[in-house]
C-alpha cells in the first residue's frame, strides 16, 4: 500500500486542529522536613514573602524564609499530619482575617475563628493582617481623651485617642487590671475595644472574658486569644490580627482602643520561630528585626484625618476623623527596663506607665510610679477640668517622694517640710483605687479639688478614702445639678467652683465619713 505524504500531513494537521489540550499551571513543591511547626519546602518558585501555602488536609502555612533552593514556612494550626514528601501549593494570597461589627462581643483566635461556642461569626469582610501604617500627611494630632477611670492615670499620665501608651512592669503587679479598667470605663463612650491576649493561660483569658461579661463590657469588645497552649505562630500573629480588626473601625471614622497583653510573649514566640528557621540570633538571641516586629504593629495606631476617612470610604463618611489607640503591655524581669524588648517598645511608644512591685506590695494599687511614668502627647487631650486641677497633684507627689527619702535620715524637720510630707501621704492614699471601679470625670475632679485645696490635710490618712467616697455620695444625692454641669462642660466655672467649695465644707462639717 502506497502512502501519500500529502494525505499524511493533512491527517496530522486535522488531528492537531481538533486537539483539546488544557494547561493547568500550578506552582508546587515538596516538604523536606517538619520541625516544631516549621516546614522546609523544596521546589517552590515564585512564592512571595508572607504568602499563604496550602498543605494536605486543608492546612495552611505562611512563607517566611525565601532561600536559594528552599522555602521556610510556619504552619498555622495543627501540623502532626504533615510528613516528608507531602505536596505544597502556593495560593497567591496573603493572610487575611475577618473584620467588621459582627466580631464585637465575640472571642476569636488569631485567624478570626470563633472559640466562644456561640456559632460562626458571619463577617462580611476580610482584610490583610499586615498593612502599611497611614503616612504622616493623613494623621491628626491627638486632641481627644481616652478616660481610663483610673485616678492616677487620668490625672498624671493622660491618654489621648490615637496615642500609643506602654504599660510596663514585672509579673503580678497589676498591668492587666489597669487595661481591663480602661475597657470597663468605655461603657457608653462610643469606643470599640479589642483585647489581644498573647501567651496567657487559657484559664486567665477565660477569667478576663467572664469579668468583661459581668460588667457589660463585652457589648463593645472583641477578644483575640492566643493562649500559651497555642503554637508560636498563633502568638506571633495575634497582635496583627487584632490590629486589623481595630483598623476597620478607625478607617470608617470611629474610635477604637486595642490592648496587647503582652508583647513580651509575642517577642518570645517570634524568637522561637526565627531560631527554628535558622535566622542569625542577635542580642538576647532575638533576631535582627525584632524592633521592626513591634514598630510596624504600633505605628498602625493613629488618629487619622477626615480626608483619610473620606478617601478610604469613597466619600461615604464625611467630616469624621477615626482613631486607634494602643495600650501595649510589656513584662519586665526583676524590674529591668533596660532589657532589649522593653527599651525597643519604650522608644516606639508615646509614653509609658511604670508599675512597680514594691508599691504594689506596699498596698499602693494601682502601683504606678508617678516619677518615671510619662505621657508625651496625652496632655493635649486632657479635659479642661482635670488639666486645671491635676498639676498640683503631680508636684505634691514628686516632692513627697523626694522628701520622704531624706526624711529617713533627718531627726528634726521644719514645719514646711513636715506639712509637705503629710500632704504627700494623703495624696498617695487618695490615688489608691480598687479594681473594676473606674471613676467618671466629675468624680476625679472633685477628688483633685479636695486634695489641692487642703481639705484632706487635717484628716487622718486612714480617713481619706472614706471621706472621698462619702463626699461623692453626698454630691450625687444633694448636688446632682452641679455634677451634671461639670460632666457636660468638662470644666469648672467660677460659680461651680464656689458651689463645690461650699458643698465640700458643708460635708466636712457634718462629719459623715
Curated annotation (Swiss-Prot):
Top-level enzyme category: translocase
Transmembrane segments: none
Broad class of where this protein is predominantly found: membrane
Family: Belongs to the ATPase alpha/beta chains family.
Coiled-coil boundaries: none
This protein's encoding gene: atpA
A GO molecular-function descriptor: ADP binding
Substrates-to-products reaction catalysed: ATP + H2O + 4 H(+)(in) = ADP + phosphate + 5 H(+)(out)
Domain of life: Bacteria
Key words of the record: ATP synthesis, ATP-binding, Cell inner membrane, Cell membrane, CF(1), Hydrogen ion transport, Ion transport, Membrane, Nucleotide-binding, Translocase, Transport
Topology versus the membrane: Peripheral membrane protein
Subcellular location: Cell inner membrane
EC number, as in UniProt: 7.1.2.2
Binding positions (ATP): 169-176
InterPro entries found in the cross-reference section: ATP_synth_asu-like_sf, ATP_synth_asu_C, ATP_synth_asu_C_sf, ATP_synth_F1_a_nt-bd_dom, ATP_synth_F1_asu, ATPase_a/bsu_AS, ATPase_F1/V1/A1_a/bsu_N, ATPase_F1/V1/A1_a/bsu_N_sf
SUPFAM superfamilies named among the record's database cross-references: C-terminal domain of alpha and beta subunits of F1 ATP synthase, N-terminal domain of alpha and beta subunits of F1 ATP synthase, P-loop containing nucleoside triphosphate hydrolases
Site (Required for activity): 373
Complex formation: F-type ATPases have 2 components, CF(1) - the catalytic core - and CF(0) - the membrane proton channel. CF(1) has five subunits: alpha(3), beta(3), gamma(1), delta(1), epsilon(1). CF(0) has three main subunits: a(1), b(2) and c(9-12). The alpha and beta chains form an alternating ring which encloses part of the gamma chain. CF(1) is attached to CF(0) by a central stalk formed by the gamma and epsilon chains, while a peripheral stalk is formed by the delta and b chains.
The organism of origin for this protein: Burkholderia vietnamiensis (strain G4 / LMG 22486)
GO cellular component: plasma membrane; proton-transporting ATP synthase complex
Its job: Produces ATP from ADP in the presence of a proton gradient across the membrane. The alpha chain is a regulatory subunit.
Entry annotated with the keyword Membrane: yes
Protein name according to UniProt: ATP synthase subunit alpha
Amino acid at each position: 500500500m502506497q502512502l501519500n505524504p500529502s494525505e499524511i500531513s493533512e491527517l496530522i494537521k486535522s488531528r492537531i486542529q481538533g486537539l483539546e489540550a488544557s494547561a493547568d499551571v500550578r506552582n508546587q513543591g515538596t516538604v523536606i522536613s517538619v520541625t516544631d511547626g516549621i516546614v522546609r519546602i523544596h521546589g517552590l518558585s515564585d512564592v512571595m514573602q508572607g504568602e499563604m501555602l496550602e498543605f494536605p488536609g486543608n492546612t495552611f502555612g505562611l512563607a517566611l524564609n525565601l532561600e536559594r533552593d528552599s522555602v521556610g514556612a510556619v504552619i498555622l494550626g495543627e501540623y502532626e499530619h504533615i510528613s516528608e514528601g507531602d505536596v505544597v501549593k502556593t495560593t497567591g494570597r496573603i493572610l487575611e482575617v475577618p473584620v467588621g461589627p459582627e466580631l464585637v462581643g465575640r472571642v476569636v483566635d488569631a485567624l478570626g475563628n470563633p472559640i466562644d461556642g456561640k456559632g460562626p461569626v458571619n463577617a462580611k469582610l476580610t482584610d490583610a493582617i499586615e498593612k502599611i501604617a497611614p503616612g504622616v500627611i493623613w494623621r491628626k494630632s491627638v486632641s481627644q481623651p481616652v478616660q481610663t477611670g483610673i485616678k492616677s492615670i487620668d490625672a498624671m499620665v493622660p491618654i489621648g485617642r490615637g496615642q500609643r501608651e506602654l504599660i510596663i512592669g514585672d509579673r503580678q503587679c497589676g498591668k492587666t487590671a489597669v487595661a481591663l479598667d480602661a475597657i470597663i470605663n468605655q461603657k457608653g463612650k462610643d469606643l470599640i475595644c479589642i483585647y489581644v491576649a498573647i501567651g496567657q493561660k487559657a484559664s486567665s483569658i477565660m477569667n478576663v472574658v467572664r469579668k468583661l461579661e459581668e460588667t457589660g463590657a463585652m457589648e463593645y469588645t472583641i477578644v483575640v486569644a492566643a493562649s500559651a497552649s497555642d503554637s508560636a505562630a498563633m502568638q506571633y500573629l495575634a497582635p496583627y490580627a487584632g490590629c486589623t480588626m481595630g483598623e476597620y473601625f478607625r478607617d470608617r471614622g470611629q474610635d477604637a482602643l486595642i490592648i496587647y497583653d503582652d508583647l513580651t510573649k509575642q517577642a518570645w514566640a517570634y524568637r522561637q520561630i526565627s531560631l527554628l528557621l535558622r535566622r542569625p540570633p542577635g542580642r538576647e538571641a532575638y533576631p535582627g528585626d525584632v524592633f521592626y516586629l513591634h514598630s510596624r504593629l504600633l505605628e498602625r495606631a493613629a488618629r487619622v484625618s477626615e480626608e483619610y476617612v473620606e478617601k478610604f470610604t469613597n466619600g461615604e463618611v464625611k467630616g469624621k476623623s477615626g482613631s486607634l489607640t494602643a495600650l501595649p503591655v510589656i513584662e519586665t524581669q526583676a524590674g529591668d527596663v533596660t532589657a532589649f524588648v522593653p527599651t525597643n517598645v519604650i522608644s516606639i511608644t508615646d509614653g509609658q506607665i511604670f508599675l512597680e512591685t514594691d508599691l504594689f506590695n506596699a498596698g499602693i494599687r494601682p502601683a504606678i510610679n508617678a516619677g518615671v511614668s510619662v505621657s508625651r502627647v496625652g496632655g493635649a487631650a486632657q479635659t479642661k477640668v482635670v488639666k486645671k486641677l491635676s498639676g498640683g497633684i503631680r508636684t505634691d507627689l514628686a516632692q513627697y517622694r523626694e522628701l520622704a527619702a531624706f526624711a529617713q535620715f533627718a531627726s528634726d524637720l521644719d514645719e514646711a517640710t513636715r506639712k509637705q510630707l503629710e500632704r504627700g501621704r494623703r495624696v498617695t492614699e487618695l490615688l489608691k483605687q480598687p479594681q473594676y471601679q473606674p471613676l467618671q470625670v466629675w468624680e476625679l475632679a472633685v477628688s483633685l479639688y479636695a486634695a489641692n485645696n487642703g481639705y484632706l490635710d487635717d484628716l487622718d490618712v486612714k480617713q481619706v478614702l472614706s471621706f472621698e467616697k462619702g463626699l461623692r455620695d453626698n454630691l450625687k444625692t444633694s448636688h446632682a445639678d452641679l455634677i451634671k454641669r461639670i460632666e457636660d462642660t468638662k470644666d469648672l466655672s467660677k460659680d461651680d467652683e464656689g458651689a463645690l467649695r461650699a458643698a465640700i465644707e458643708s460635708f466636712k462639717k457634718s462629719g459623715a465619713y
